[in-house]
Amino acid sequence: MARVTMLVDTSKCTACRGCQVACKQWWDLPASKTTQTGSYENPRDLEPNTLTRITFHEYESGGKLQWLFLAWGCVHCAQAACVDVCPTYALKQNDQGFVSFERDLCNGCGYCTQVCPFNVPRLETINALTGEAKASKCTFCQDRVTNGLQPACVKTCTTGALQWSERDALLTKAKARVDWLKGRGYAQAQLYGENELGGLGRLFVLTAPPAAYGLPEKPEYPVLANVWQNLLQPFGYVAAGLTAVGLVVNWFATRRAQLANVETIVPGKEE
């Protein structure tokens, strides 16, 4: 099955935040209580109830100050560390290439929040008494795209800053857009996400270096995820297996001891 991808063309984004609203509306997420912090960003970060948001960045180049806007959320890495460390398989690579999330399977361990190179997943405490928690992240509206629809944010974008299609088609379009921008004076225009971490599910056409948007120049698969995948997780399976074997052996040993201690009573015989 062809991999589907989102293209974020920052040169077309007007920071209207329609994508933020559409996301909350589709997922029936409540508004967040915020305070004025001196920035146009609202809220200031991703939250359990804010899966998509527009980031604002001031960038100075050639003596000129520019506003850079970015539609931000999960980038759906092909080499997704969050998927590799999830012990309950709540996070999976969908056949269409994006990272799906099943909230009902999440045990709130928070491993995904520790290994994401882009610091995307958020952990929400559901029950303070029991400590129950659940993770959250953008799923590309998995219920929509698996039924042939666009993500809600893409559907509502009026400028074409957000686009949705097969990955190869969007890569071709994004590269052509970068060339067009360079021909119009955007010397630092570039494509971000083609090869990073196996290829991101959210491609970006940038008009400035990635760092200007708060993006890592060279995101890397985290060492912690490698340790978990290659050492701790296999050890956990072995430990679980040994525990199960031990319980079975213990049951038989206990049962044998119980049978050995049963007093044999011969009918008709009295002490």
Q: Each PLM stretch: what is its role?
A:
Residues 1-271:
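Non-ligating segments of multi-cofactor redox enzymes
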